[in-house]
Amino acid sequence: MENIALVGMPSCGKTTMARLLSEKLNRVYYDTDKLIEEREGKIPEIFVNKGEKYFRDLETKVLKEVSKKTGIIIATGGGTPLREINRDLLLQNSLVIYLDRDIKNLETEGRPLSKNLETLEKMYGERNKIYQDISHIKIKVIEDEEKTLEKILEEIKNYENFSN
């Protein structure tokens, strides 16, 4: 059974949608950022104390572990798809869904790389193409979680190559 992996900007709703999809589809979900925090502490502290490269290495390590599983839902960190190895890991057995949320609705508090709207706009410009290139499905996130979930479920159902 294929995995479902959610990608997108920080705070676009990946963790929330992974949890809701998990409930609807009766699948276990893994949040790569949460797994990193359980092992290493808060992400902003990792960035300050050990640097972004150390964090990205942890991200790859955790993704390698979870992507060996099947039939799960993976909520990735916003920067996970930036590394080619991570893109390859996601694509090897996952239906990748890009959650595209309006930049003005993204949270900035507690996010080491997205401190304000200007930073988010720059980040979006750098990452949007990567997210689009890696994804099988793109969902425009709206503020109503249930409606967004319904859109995701409908797109999964309609995706011709997906084995549930």
Predicted feature locations:
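Hydrophobic anchor at the beta1->P-loop junction of P-loop NTPases
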Residues: L6
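P-loop (Walker A) phosphate-binding loop of NTP-binding proteins
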Residues: M9
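Conserved glycine(s) of the Walker
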Residues: G13
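NTP-dependent small-molecule kinase module
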Residues: T16, L20, K24, K69, ...
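Post-Walker A helix-loop "phosphate-sensing" segment adjacent to the P-loop in P-loop NTPases
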Residues: E23-T32
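ATP-dependent small-molecule kinase phosphotransfer cores
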Residues: K34-P81, I85-L91
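Short glycine-rich anion-binding loops that position phosphate/pyrophosphate groups of nucleotides
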Residues: G77-T80, D102-K104, D144
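A glycine- and Lys/Arg-enriched "phosphate-lid" helix/loop adjacent to the NTP-binding pocket
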Residues: N93-I130
